[in-house]
Swiss-Prot record:
Sample GO molecular function, one term: glycine-tRNA ligase activity
HAMAP family xref list: Gly_tRNA_synth_B
Binding residues annotated for substrate, in chain numbering: R98, E172, F219, E220, Q221, M222, E223, E328, P329, S330, L331, G332
EC code: 6.1.1.14
Binding residues annotated for ATP, in chain numbering: 204-206, 214-219, 288-289, 332-335
GO annotation terms (biological process): glycyl-tRNA aminoacylation
Annotated protein name in UniProt: Glycine--tRNA ligase
Function: Catalyzes the attachment of glycine to tRNA(Gly).
GO cellular component, one term: cytoplasm
Protein source organism: Geobacillus kaustophilus (strain HTA426)
Catalytic activity from the UniProt record: tRNA(Gly) + glycine + ATP = glycyl-tRNA(Gly) + AMP + diphosphate
InterPro entries, A to Z: aa-tRNA-synt_IIb (IPR002314), aa-tRNA-synth_II (IPR006195), aa-tRNA-synth_II/BPL/LPL (IPR045864), Anticodon-bd (IPR004154), Anticodon-bd_dom_sf (IPR036621), Gly-tRNA_synthase/POLG2 (IPR027031), Gly_tRNA_ligase_bac (IPR022961), GlyRS-like_core (IPR033731)
Subcellular location as annotated: Cytoplasm
Length: 460
């Protein structure tokens, strides 16, 4: 059955995946805290990304750059001049809207598909009037003209709030990679092609955040900047598109819920000569998970111009000197975590007429890899010994409260792939019952084989 966003939000809060931020003070709009299970799920996703994009990659190395950077960075990157969203205000209720999304949603409701992102502001004004678009909040059709709104969060470094001390929270992790290109290339003795990967927080003062953790002002990115010889960028662009899609599928995401969408010319960012989004079919519609962009040599050239640093690369095979081109697969950690939660959530009708809620998370992503359940509290000592051994290697839950059936259901709801039941026979034969979350089938296994069994099941 199709899940709604309301069901996902309720389940996430009820089971400790995601809580509203600052909840005891009435919250802060569009801020979310990852609970005990949410932080495990998100961390497992980040580990899975790092494993395939860095650890197992012959090309890529990692970086963790500072959030606060010299403001000249953002002049060079174009963010101070170009990092804007089109904004429009309702004159009646004062609600503020991102103009392109307002228009796209209104047209979609009329059965018209149109990409508005990238259109001139005057054209957006025309579309609002032409299609008689109303404010979603109050129904008024009286809007201001569309204008640009810079998305960067400004703050001050030091004790005085003067323009000389202005700095910005980074709107993307990519620029920390570009300014360190030479440091990484020299110290790691990398030859092209090679990539630099980073996971970190970014901040954008979004006009209309929403849809739970899909669009927030504070978010986490998993980005790769992959540098190659000019002229080879499109073959690497295709390579990384497929690699990214395969990564999602290898972790169990349903292929029917994924599509690749190429950006039209008018949509392209100022630095890109080709961009493809990997989109996921959320309950509210298709939304971007992964942006894969060919950024050409724009960033390195700009930082050369503004810093005076030489980013030319000497190709020792051809003796050529050139500025490398760059392919950027940029994935939102919060968005992909939400997508995996939605993709895994199911309410199954069982043969006895009852319904069970289950999250079919890939075992590599599941917050707990297993739960140890003593059949009776009298068996707690033996069950605890198994738990204490397994937690040296995996995240494992221990639960001795309630009937075994209710405990199974609790673990199904949080996506635990295997329940290990320690019963009275276990005391005699040294074996336990292992229940599979998805099939609900049960097998007996020797206690000594549990570690190897779980290691095999969580591999991807």
């Amino acid at each position: 059955m199709a899940v709604t966003m309301e069901e996902i939000v309720a389940h996430a809060k009820h089971r400790g995946f995601v809580f509203p931020g600052s909840e005891i003070y009435g919250g802060l709009a569009n801020t979310w805290d990852y609970g005990p299970l949410g932080v495990e799920l998100k961390n497992n996703i980040k580990r899975a990304w790092w494993k395939k994009f860095v650890q197992e990659s012959p090309y890529n190395v990692g970086l963790d750059a500072a959030i606060l950077m010299n403001p000249r960075t953002w002049e060079a990157s174009g963010h101070l001049g170009n990092f804007n969203d089109p904004m429009v205000d309702c004159k009646q209720c004062k609600a503020r809207h991102r103009a392109d999304k307002l228009i796209e949603k209104a047209l979609e409701e009329k059965g018209i598909e149109m990409i508005v992102d990238g259109l001139p502001l005057a054209k957006m004004d025309e579309l609002i009037k032409e299609y008689d678009i109303a404010c979603p909040e109050c129904g008024s059709r009286d809007f201001t003209n569309v204008r640009q709104f810079n998305l960067m969060f400004k703050t001050y470094q030091g004790v005085t709030e003067s323009s000389a001390n202005e700095i910005y929270l980074r709107p993307e992790t990519a620029q920390g990679i570009f300014v360190n290109f030479k440091n990484v290339q020299r110290t790691m003795r990398k030859k092209l092609p090679f990539g630099i990967a980073q996971i970190g927080k970014s901040f954008r003062n979004e006009i209309t955040p929403g849809n739970f953790t899909f669009r927030t002002r504070e978010f986490e990115q998993m980005e790769l900047e992959f540098f190659c010889k000019p002229g080879e960028e499109l073959q690497w662009f295709d390579y990384w598109k497929q690699f990214c899609k395969d990564w999602l599928l290898s972790l169990g995401m349903k292929e029917d819920n994924i599509r690749l969408r190429d950006h039209a010319k008018e949509e392209l960012s100022h630095y890109s000569n080709a961009t493809t989004d990997i989109e996921y079919h959320f309950p509210f519609g298709w939304g971007e998970l992964w942006g894969i962009a060919s950024r050409t040599d724009y960033d390195l050239k700009r930082h050369m111009e503004y810093s005076g640093e030489d980013f030319h690369y000497l190709d020792q095979e051809t003796n050529e000197r050139y500025i490398p081109y760059c392919i950027e697969p940029s994935l939102g950690a919060d968005r992909v975590t939400l997508a995996f939660m939605i993709d895994a959530y199911d309410e199954e009708e069982l043969e006895d007429g009852t319904t069970r809620t289950v999250m079919h998370l890939h075992p590599a992503l599941a917050p707990y890899k297993a739960a140890v359940l003593p059949l009776s509290k009298k068996l707690a000592d033996g069950a605890h010994r198994i738990y204490e051994e397994l937690v040296k290697h995996f995240m494992v839950d221990y639960d001795e409260t309630g009937s075994i059936g209710k405990r199974y259901r609790r673990q199904d709801e949080i996506g635990t792939p295997f329940c290990i039941t320690y019963d009275f026979e276990s005391e005699q034969d040294g074996q336990v019952t292992v229940r599979d979350r998805d099939t609900m089938e049960q097998v007996r296994l020797p206690i000594g084989e549990l570690k190897a069994f779980l290691e095999e099941k969580i591999a991807f």
